[in-house]
Amino acid sequence: MEETEKKIATQEGRLFSKMKVFLLSLTCACLTKSLSGVYMNSMLTQIERQFDISTSVAGLINGSFEIGNLFFIVFVSYFGTKLHRPVVIGIGCVIMGLGCLLMSLPHFFMGRYEYETTISPTGNLSSNSFLCMENRTQTLKPTQDPAECVKEMKSLMWICVMVGNIIRGIGETPIVPLGISYIEDFAKSENSPLYIGILEMGKVAGPIFGLLLGSYCAQIYVDIGSVNTDDLTITPSDTRWVGAWWIGFLVCAGVNILTSIPFFFLPKALPKKGQQENVAVTKDGKVEKYGGQAREENLGITKDFLTFMKRLFCNPIYMLFILTSVLQVNGFINKFTFLPKYLEQQYGKSTAEAIFLIGVYSLPPICLGYLIGGFIMKKFKITVKKAAYLAFCLSVFEYLLFLCHFMLTCDNAAVAGLTTSYKGVQHQLHVESKVLADCNTRCSCSTNTWDPVCGDNGVAYMSACLAGCKKFVGTGTNMVFQDCSCIQSLGNSSAVLGLCKKGPECANRLQYFLILTIIISFIYSLTAIPGYMVFLRCVKSEEKSLGVGLHTFCIRVFAGIPAPVYFGALIDRTCLHWGTLKCGQRGACRMYDINSFRHIYLGLPIALRGSSYLPAFFILILMRKFQFPGDIDSSATDHTEMMLGEKESEHTDVHGSPQVENDGELKTKL
């Protein structure tokens, strides 16, 4: 007898170790998948400039990840539970790695990146068309050489990036639904909040590394190793700069493939941790499952797929939770996807600086909030109803704080002919005829070229020619233009490359913006675990995997795919000046009206998230009519199926189960 008990204890220790290995492996998988996703998001502006595409097309590339996920999520979530879940997750990690590898390939098949400029890299006087020269006979126009126009077709290689992102989405499909269902099936229910909190921490730790990687790659010129960077006339803060986006995708490919290895050595199933009655020891010392665990597995095989779908669609709390999530995620995706671009345009930061600030100020508090939220749920054994009220109140408070972002804004950069007149007076935007003035009408300047210079008077000009500059000294980024007729500043009339920097007042507002971001991110993450536990507890155990998959499917269809596209299209409408390709085609946007940009970037998420509190409020009302076994008896937390309590003596399952007379029968039914 003692020998049998020792075997049981030894086997339970092994099972516990395997659960920890699975949890660690799944956390690493969540980390690498989120690393890849956030890195992709951080490089969106670089890809937009590399291929000279609009923000809406860049949003389509970003949303293509959801397209790949879309076609497989529901079927993987349902049928994946019948397969070897750890192995399926491992295969998904390999596919993600291959997708990242494909996304980096266009760099190796394209020529060197040629940014829009009229300045010769060596400052050769024979090609000084960037200066103001009176009586110039040749007007600067886009090149119409057919050979060069064909060369521009390389920009269509963004499709390869999109296909790679679709493949990455396919590989990501099984990780979350199968991973969470595996934990829910084989771990104590009271430990689930902590385990999910650890997973969420991994999901946020991944973006931290992804943003740091993105910040590093954004500082490296895209053609590093094949060009002399000393000859460049642009810096990382220039809107024409393209960082080495392809390097990060190679890193993501490697870590995703390495993460897949442990999953191929994990078992298909584990006995429910802590439930000895579900474990039997045979004569040869092996552990076998019986009872509830076996019945649940058989039930999952025999149940009809459409029956589960019908139950989920008839679950009011589940459907309202999906509606709330879709509205919330629409606002969150729109805000996070274009946050680097917003920091660039609003506060004058380079892409590398913007990505670094996001990683330092936004993600660590989110990571901490996820962990604390899961710990609080486990430590204080918060019931499902209390968790719902907690999540709702914290979310509303965070939403009100988000409104303060409207007060932390900067003015448009002073660019003569776009945002201000040549005399420094602000005028109506989008006026094309204001580009030329009396000081440069005889210079025969191109009005489309974007080669900005900053004058000593604090006003930027679209090019040295439009500033009326006739001389220059230096080479590369150290060039200084002199004798500029449009610049009048205490007798000095020189200019340097690039837009003028924002003032100290704008820098102070950025600091307040970042501090507010820390507070908002922490509160937002605190609501995630309580809210997610409400979601998990409102469906039966055999429906959880499909429920998670359907929830993810709806978010993909109604938020993940359309949100970046329509949001990017709205941002495109705020563009003040578009880049010009060799054949005269429109390239990427070089400068935005930051006032209109701000109204869209902040206003649309506020409207979407504000509307999400209506279905969330109905969830709180409906939860009063439902009874959770855990709200009555804490020992019933392992059986947290939700029951409708219309009468004290009569309990009906939310999915339409027959009546049960006592808690013991309830456990048997479930």
Curated annotation (Swiss-Prot):
pH dependence per the UniProt record: Optimum pH is 6.5 with estrone 3-sulfate, taurocholate, prostaglandin E2 and L-thyroxine T4 as substrates.
Chain segments carrying region Disordered: 645-670
Carbohydrate-modified residues: N124, N135, N492
Site keyed Essential for pH-sensitivity of estrone 3-sulfate transport: positions: H107
Record topological domains on the Cytoplasmic side: 1-20, 81-86, 185-203, 268-311, 378-381, 537-545, 624-670
Keywords: Cell membrane, Disulfide bond, Glycoprotein, Ion transport, Membrane, Phosphoprotein, Transmembrane, Transmembrane helix, Transport
Cellular compartments annotated: Basolateral cell membrane
Membrane topology recorded in Swiss-Prot or TrEMBL: Multi-pass membrane protein
Post-translational modification as stated in the protein's UniProt record: Glycosylated.
Claim: Nucleus is one of the keywords in the record: no
Listed name of the protein: Solute carrier organic anion transporter family member 1A1
Origin species: Rattus norvegicus
Annotated gene: Slco1a1
